[in-house]
């Protein structure tokens, strides 16, 4: 159980509670979760964050009415800066997007600007918003994380409780730069405990990390309850703490739920994330 499971900010969320669905625009549906909630137990504060990054959201169920009342659809891509005060709670984001369904907007740019304004206000940070017509993204190939996949190792695992100590002593003597990938990342929603399925890419330069130890560590998230963004920051923090690489990037892409997927990345070096969807997205 996370140390902040009973944080007062969580009690105020609609997540896990019966909810009415509103189809007319309502910015108040958005709900924020303070990033400090999980960062402070890790010793992370705004003036000493060891990373930069963003939470990339893909919006697959976005619709509104044009000035003639004709429904419009688009796919949205949101990038929320990791130094924002808050993250956006995903169920509230879904409810907020549903409120566009029967609302008239003059054009797609008006929708984009509304999203950017409201999300920035809720997160108290920088947000970029792009909206794509379907013919702009139709036919795009399925992407794949570059790197060596950890998942084919012939190892026996019988514990699925989170344990950062798997990384204790995992840093070897050889100095390398490598990208490691696992599709076995699975954690659970902090509130509902519904499963969150993801793939993760870890790129680092420094003492070589034992691949078996790293896979055991990632699998130990299987019963762990945290939001996507928090899991990625925990992975970054634990690898830095135990393995002390010179550079590190952690990027996870999660399967969609409620028409949204969340794809957080954190890095202490130059990094440009791929934004194409993976096979399970």
Swiss-Prot record:
One Pfam family cited in the UniProt record for this chain: QueF
Transmembrane segments: none
Gene Ontology biological-process annotations: queuosine biosynthetic process; tRNA modification
E.C. number: 1.7.1.13
Sample GO molecular function, one term: preQ1 synthase activity
Listed pathway(s): tRNA modification; tRNA-queuosine biosynthesis
One GO cellular component term noted in the UniProt record for this chain: cytoplasm
Oligomeric and partner information: Homodimer.
PANTHER family in UniProt: NADPH-DEPENDENT 7-CYANO-7-DEAZAGUANINE REDUCTASE
Name of this protein: NADPH-dependent 7-cyano-7-deazaguanine reductase
The species this protein was found in: Yersinia pseudotuberculosis serotype O:1b (strain IP 31758)
């Amino acid at each position: 159980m996370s140390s902040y499971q009973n944080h007062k900010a969580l009690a105020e969320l609609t997540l896990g509670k019966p909810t009415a669905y509103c189809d007319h625009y309502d910015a108040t549906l958005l709900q924020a979760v303070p990033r400090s909630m999980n960062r402070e137990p890790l010793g992370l504060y705004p003036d000493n964050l060891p990373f930069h990054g963003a939470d990339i959201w893909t919006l697959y169920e976005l619709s509104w009415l044009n000035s003639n009342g004709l429904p419009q659809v688009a796919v949205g891509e949101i990038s929320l800066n990791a130094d924002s005060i808050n993250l956006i709670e995903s169920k509230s984001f879904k409810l907020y997007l549903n409120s566009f369904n029967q609302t008239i907007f003059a054009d797609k740019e008006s929708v984009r600007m509304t999203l950017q304004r409201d999300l920035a206000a809720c997160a108290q940070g920088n947000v970029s918003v792009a909206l794509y017509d379907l013919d702009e993204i139709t036919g795009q190939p399925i992407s794949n994380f570059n790197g060596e996949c950890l998942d084919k190792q012939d190892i026996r695992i019988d514990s699925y409780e989170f344990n950062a100590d798997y990384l204790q002593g995992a840093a070897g003597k050889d100095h390398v730069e490598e990208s490691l990938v696992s599709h076995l990342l699975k954690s659970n929603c902090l509130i509902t405990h519904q499963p969150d399925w993801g793939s993760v890419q870890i790129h680092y330069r420094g003492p070589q990390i034992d691949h078996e130890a790293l896979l055991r560590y990632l699998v130990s998230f299987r019963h762990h309850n945290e939001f996507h963004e928090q899991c990625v920051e925990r992975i970054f923090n634990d690898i830095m703490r135990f393995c002390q690489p010179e550079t590190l990037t952690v990027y996870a892409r999660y399967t969609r739920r409620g028409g949204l997927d969340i794809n957080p990345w954190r890095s202490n070096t130059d990094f440009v994330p791929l934004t194409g969807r993976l096979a399970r997205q």
